[in-house]
A protein has these predicted regions:
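N-terminal basic/disordered segments at the start of proteins
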Residues: 17-33
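Conserved phosphate/ATP/ADP-binding segment of small-molecule kinases
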Residues: 120-195
Length: 270
C-alpha cells in the first residue's frame, strides 16, 4: 500500500520509545503515512524519568530539515521538543525556506515525570515567533499556562487561554484538558470563527507516556490526508483514547500507550 501522505517530524528522541520521535513515527506509520525526521535532542529516559538530554547542534537540525525536504517535500510538519532558542531560530529559518503550509506545533516543555525540556529564553521566542507560523498549536494545561502567563483552574480558564493564544497569532488552538481534576476530559478547540469542546472519558491508568506527542502526530497525519482541522483533532483524540485503553502495561512508571490498535485505525478512516 502506498503511503497516504509524507510527514516531517521535528522533535527529540525518547530512548524508551514511548514519546518523542519514536511515538511520532509509530503514529504516522500506523495511520498509513510516511514519516521523516529531524532530531532536535537525544534523551536517555525510561517510564520513571529522564536521565539526560543531549542537544543536537542547531546547524545540524537545519541541515536535516532542508536536506530531507529538498528531496521529499513533506505534506505536513509536526514540531515537538525544542529545548533552546538557537534550535527554534534554526527551525524558523528552515520553515521560511521549505514553505510547508500545514504545521502542527506541540510545545513540549515538561516530561511526564516532571523534567523540564526547554529553557526560558526559548519559551519567549516560541511564544513570539513560532506560534504564528503554526496551523495548530496543541499545548496541555501547564504549557498553556506558561505560554499565556495565566493560571488555568477551570474550563473557562482554558477557553480564556485559548483566546490569548489566538491573540499571540495562533491560527487554531487545541488545549488538552487532562490535567484538570474533572470526571471527563475536556479539550478546547478554538479559532477566530469556530469553537468546540471535545469530551472524552477519563481513563484510570498511569500509562499515558507520549499521549501529547501521539495526539499531535495523529492530527498532523489526518490533516495531511485532507481532513479539515477540527475533524483532524476529533480523529486524533479518538486514536489516542483507544491507544490508552489498549496500553501494553510496560515499565514501572508512566508506561507507553499502544500505537498499533488496528481496530481504532480502521474506525477513524471510515
Amino acid at each position: 500500500m502506498k503511503p497516504k501522505s509524507k510527514i516531517l517530524i521535528i522533535a527529540g528522541s525518547d530512548s524508551s520509545g514511548g514519546a518523542g520521535i519514536q511515538a511520532d513515527l509509530k503514529t504516522v506509520t500506523s495511520l498509513g503515512s510516511y514519516g521523516m525526521t529531524a532530531i532536535t535532542a537525544v534523551t536517555s529516559q525510561n517510564t520513571r524519568g529522564v536521565k539526560s538530554i543531549v542537544p543536537i547542534d542547531p546547524k545540524e537540525i537545519f541541515n536535516q530539515i532542508i536536506f530531507t525536504s529538498k528531496d521529499i517535500k513533506p505534506d505536513a510538519i509536526k514540531i515537538g521538543m525544542l529545548h533552546s532558542s538557537e534550535v527554534i531560530k534554526s527551525i524558523i529559518s528552515s520553515l521560511d525556506i521549505i514553505k510547508v503550509r500545514k504545521i502542527i506545533l506541540d510545545p513540549v516543555m515538561v516530561a511526564k515525570g516532571g523534567a523540564k525540556l526547554i529553557d526560558k529564553k526559548a519559551i519567549n521566542i516560541l511564544r513570539e515567533k513560532l506560534i504564528k507560523r503554526a496551523t495548530l498549536v496543541t499545548p496541555n494545561i501547564p504549557e498553556a499556562e506558561i505560554l499565556t502567563k495565566t493560571k488555568i483552574m477551570s474550563k473557562e480558564d482554558m477557553i480564556f487561554a485559548a483566546h490569548r493564544l489566538i491573540d499571540l497569532g495562533a491560527k487554531n488552538v487545541l488545549i488538552k484538558g487532562g490535567h484538570l481534576k474533572s470526571k471527563k476530559v475536556e479539550d478546547i478547540f478554538l479559532n477566530k470563527s469556530d469553537f468546540k469542546i471535545f469530551i472524552s472519558s477519563r481513563h484510570s491508568t498511569k500509562n499515558t507516556h507520549g499521549t501529547g506527542c501521539t495526539l499531535s502526530s495523529a492530527i498532523t497525519t489526518f490533516l495531511s490526508c485532507g481532513k479539515p482541522i477540527k475533524k483532524a483533532c476529533e480523529l486524533g483524540i479518538k486514536y489516542v483514547n483507544s491507544a490508552i485503553l489498549s496500553n501494553p502495561k510496560y515499565g514501572k512508571g508512566h508506561g507507553p500507550i499502544n500505537h498499533l490498535n488496528s481496530m481504532e485505525i480502521k474506525k477513524v478512516f471510515k
